Amino acid sequence: MNADVSAFNLVKTTTIESLNIQYEEYEHLTTGARHIHLASDNNENVFMVALRTVPTDSTGVAHILEHTSLCGSKRFPVRDPFFMMIRRSLNTFMNAFTSSDWTAYPFASQNKKDFNNLLEVYLDAVFFARLDPLDFSQEGHRLEFEEPNNPDSDLVYKGVVFNEMKGAMSSISSQLWQAVGESLFPDTTYGVNSGGEPENITDLSYEQLQAFYQTHYHPDNATFVTFGDISAKEHQFKIQEFALRHFAPLNKRIEVPLQDKFDNAIRVTKQFPISEEEAKGDKTHLVMAWVLGNIRDPLELMSTHLLSAVLFENSASPLQQALETTDLGTAPSPLCGMDDSGLEMVFVCGVEGSSEDKLEQLEALVLNALQGVADNGVDTQRMTALLDQLELQQREVGGGGYPYGLQIMLSCLPTAIHRGDAAAALNIDPILTQLRESIQDPNFIKSLVKRLLIDNQHRVSLVMTPDTKLSQQRIEQEQQKLAAIKETLTEEEKQNIITTAAALKERQTVDDDPEILPKVDLTDIPPVTDIPEFSEQKMAKRSATFYPQGTNGLSYQQVITQLPTLNEQQSALLGIHNRVLTDLGVGSKDYLATQNWQTQVCGGINAQSSIRSDLNNEQQVSGYFTLSAKGLNIHNNA
C-alpha cells in the first residue's frame, strides 16, 4: 500500500472544530489531482469526484456526458450500473450532479465493503466510460421517424436530456435565471445553459462529446473529496489502483475566467412563452441583478451572505418588505437572494406579476431601499441575530435528504473547484469572529451595501414579457428544421435512423449479467442496528423525550400533538393552517416582530401534520400536528 500512497503529497492539514473534522488536503504527484479528506468519527463514509466542466455553448455537452458516463464502463460494461448497484448495495446515497461549471459523482454508505464496491464502480464510470454511440443517441438526442419503420413519416427528435430540458426550460424561473446569466456573463460559461437548450442540444455531435470527455474527465482536472472514518491512505490506495495509475499529465488547465466588469448598468428585454388563458392580467417579470465578488475570498463570501440576510431574511427585512408591499407586482420574484454557486456571486431582486412600463419605478424602489440601509444602517442586535443564523447553517447536521458529509462537501465544492482555499470555506468561525467585531461599527453595513450594490455598475435590469405566440413559433421552427433535414437524407441515412431506433429498442430488452458488478452478502451486514438512547422527564405537565446526539452545538425541538378527528372541510384547511401559522404574530408581538424574534433565537419554526399507524396495530391510524424548531444551544432558554 505504501508505494501507491506515496503518489500523493500532503499539502495541508487543519482541525475544523465547529464541524468536528480534520481537514487534510493532498495532491497527486503525477497528474496534479486534488484529494480533500474530511476525517471524522462518522461511519457514514462519503465519496465524491468532481470535475470542472466548462461548456462554451448551450448544447448540454456536460449534462449529456454525465448521463452517458453512467451507461457502462470498461470493467463494468452493463447498460445501467447505477440502477443495478442500488439493488446490490447498502448505500445511503447515490447520484450525479451537473452544475454550471462542475460535474460531481457522489455516494455514501455506512458499510465499508459496500463503500469500496461503489468506489470501484464510480471510478470506472468517470475515468473509463464506454461512451457508446448508441448511449449518446439514447441519453442525448437522435432522429427517429414518427412511425419508427416508416421513412415516409415525419422526423422527430428524441433523447433523455433533450426531453428533460424541454420540461426544465418550460419553467419561468429557469428561463429567468438563464436570462440573468446571459445578461450578466456574456463572455463566460455562466452565459450559456450547461444543462442544454433544447434547440441547441440537437447540434451536439458524438465526436464533440468524446472531445469534451477527453479534456474534462481527466485526473488533472479532478477534485476527489472523502468524508468519514476511513483513512485518507485507504482511499488513496483505491483511487491510485483503480484510476490514477493509468494516466499521464494532460497539461491542460481548465478554469472559468472572471467576467470583465460593466462600465454602466444595462437594461435587457426578453420574452417567455405563455398560453392565451394564462396571459390574462399583468404577467411580466422585472428583476435587477448584480455581479458581486468572487467566492475564493471567504470574508467577502460571508459578508455578502450577511448583506443578503440583512435585505431578505424575512418580511421585516428592508428589501423583502419593500417588494412584498409594493403595488408594482403581485409578489417578490422567485429569484430574490444571493447565489454563490459559481466563481462570482450574483445578487437578484425583483417582482413578478408586473408590467414593462413599471421598470423605472422598480429600480427606484429597490435603490431607495438599499439607500435606506446605507443611510440608517442596521441595529446591532439584528446583525448579531443574522450572524447566529449563518453559524446555525454551518453547524447543522443532516437535513435536505443528503448525508451530513455530503452537505459539508457541497458547501466547499465551489471554492475547491475554482482552486480556492476549501478549508477556509469550511472553517467559518474565524470569519464570524471577524464579522462580529465589524458589525459593532455602524458604518460596516452602510459601506458594504454601497460597495456591493449601490455603486456597483455591473448590473442588469431585466424585463421578461409574456408572449402567447412564442411557444407555437418554437414548435414550428423545430418542425421546419426537421423537414429540412429529411429533404437531404439519402436512402442509406434513412435506413440508419430506422436501424438505430430498432437497436435501442432491442437493447432495452437485453438483461445484463448482474454478477459483473460487485455486491455485499448477508455476512457483510451487521445483525444489529444502532438504536439511539433516550430519556424522559416531565416539562410543563407534559412528558418530554430527550435524545442525546452529536449535533455540533445545535438543539432540535419538536412538540407533537395528536389531532382529533377532522371533518372534510377541516382537513382541507389543515395545510393552509400549517402554512400561515408560523408567519402570524405571537402574544403581544405582531407578525414582523415575531419574525425578528425567530431570527434572534432559532432557525425558524415549522408546522406540519402527518398520519401515522399505531406501533402495535398497523390498521389503526391517527393524525398528528408537529411544531418544530432548531437553534444554537446558547438560545435554549429563549
Predicted region positions:
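Conserved phosphate-chemistry cores used by DNA topoisomerases
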Residues: 164-165, 201-202
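His/Glu-rich zincin catalytic helix
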Residues: 1-82, 110, 120-123, 170, ...
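Aromatic-residue-lined binding/catalytic grooves and analogous aromatic/hydrophobic interfacial grooves
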Residues: 452
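M16 family metallopeptidases and their MPP-like homologs
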Residues: 44-54, 80-128, 135-146, 174-199, ...
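Extended serine/threonine-enriched, polar tracts that run as long, contiguous segments within proteins
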Residues: 206-209
